[in-house]
Amino acid sequence: MKKYILSLDQGTTSSRAILFNKKGEIVHSAQKEFTQHFPKPGWVEHNAQEIWGSILAVIATCLSEADVKPEQIAGIGITNQRETTVVWDKTTSKPIYNAIVWQSRQTAEICDELKEKGYSEMVREKTGLLIDAYFSGTKVKWILDNVEGAREKAENGDLLFGTIDSWLVWKLSGGKAHVTDYSNASRTLMFNIHDLQWDDELLEMLTVPKSMLPEVRPSSEIYGETIDYHFFGQNVPIAGVAGDQQAALFGQACFGEGMAKNTYGTGCFMLMNTGEKAVASEHGLLTTIAWGIDGKVNYALEGSIFVAGSAIQWLRDGMRMFKDASESEVYASRVESTDGVYVVPAFVGLGTPYWDSEVRGAMFGVTRGTTKEHFIRATLESLAYQTKDVLCAMEADSGIELKTLRVDGGAVKNNFLMKFQSDILDVPVERPVINETTALGAAYLAGLAVGYWKNQDEIKEQWHMDKRFEPTMEAKTSEELYAGWKKAIEATKAFK
């Protein structure tokens, strides 16, 4: 009987189930979107029960359409939108409030108070993160402070907290396993990434009872089994968990120290594997756990760019410059350069290394000769410049010079962008055959735990390149272009 690994990719707007075979190839997939709730400006919430329903639906669809029987599943891997927070009743398994999503800013005031009390340095040292509404800790505090009776129930040990991975493992196992992995725990603002424990001082700062927290386990391990009524009568091992960006790093087989990947989605997330040492950043990067496997923990530096693919959507939908995103490449290639035009797509502020949420988008160097083509090209180039900003910070912090950059996500289909990225970084850019690296990473973690794949060396062999983009631009030219970008950033920051 042929066996497969099932990957559950629980994202911000949809849930997906993807079946992988022994070669790491996609056999079949199913996807289901769910509702976004915006109760107030800047707030983003999901219904955790609806997310659970969407997961059950995609599992059923994927298996039936692929004609794969439940007993053919060797293991389940889970990857998830990180930081999104669920608090549920231990007895009924019902959430006491909506899931508060990573993007939601509803805890910004709590963060300001914590900063004013002088906690920033302690948080940075212990967690590798900044005090920000992005991370889970303040979201848990908000739920306990704002939902009637929640704090009392939590103090009595009746409530559980989890990021989305924990919630799904709890539901799949019928409430038998309350766990998370190192990569997800490292995004909560409550976990000490050095001694790998929930931290009493951080919990006290956030007034979160320890009894709510899941057990933290390696990213590749059997956490429990599916309860038969949730998996068509089968008890399948739930064997791999990692947050989406860390899973993509694993799926790209970036196992060596200094290997890095950049995911071009709505925003960009760039992670560099720093091996077994947690590198503290001096340049606005986050220090995070990549994964824990075989008794060892790998760390990573992470840079976040807020606007990437969404800038291309803006050209299409907001500026109506083309009907299909793929046309952006055609227009950009019609001109030799941007003719001195720079677009800074700071629509929601700037991320790494600037961390400025007040600044807004800008355009510079426009003349009477500027055309639509120049404008589109400048917008695409801005993705590459922002990536260089992050890479410069990574190289400065880690002391590691990048040899190649592996890429994934929607925008990597754009050959113009990938070539320009290679030129501006002066390193080769490698695009893999399988672009679903996040789901693949979760599948690999699960497959290793159940012996479906032998080891990381076997996985490394399965990474196949679709195309390698080599830098050909003269150093002088790329330096001048990048200097222009830095000027544009400074000017943008000055206009508030």
From Swiss-Prot:
One of its GO terms (cellular component) is cytosol. InterPro entries: ATPase_NBD, Carb_kinase_FGGY, Carb_kinase_FGGY_CS, FGGY_C, FGGY_N, Glycerol_kin. Homotetramer and homodimer (in equilibrium). ADP binds at residues 12, 16, 266, 309, 410, 414. One of its GO terms (molecular function) is ATP binding. This is Glycerol kinase. The lineage of its organism: Bacteria, Bacillati, Bacillota, Bacilli, Bacillales. The phosphoenolpyruvate-dependent sugar phosphotransferase system (PTS), including enzyme I, and histidine-containing protein (HPr) are required for the phosphorylation, which leads to the activation of the enzyme. Pfam families: FGGY_C, FGGY_N. Key enzyme in the regulation of glycerol uptake and metabolism. Catalyzes the phosphorylation of glycerol to yield sn-glycerol 3-phosphate. The keyword Kinase applies. Activated by phosphorylation and inhibited by fructose 1,6-bisphosphate (FBP). Its EC number is 2.7.1.30. It catalyses: glycerol + ATP = sn-glycerol 3-phosphate + ADP + H(+). Sn-glycerol 3-phosphate binds at residues 12, 82-83, 134, 244. NCBIfam families: glycerol_kin, PRK00047.1. The modification Phosphohistidine is found at residue 230.
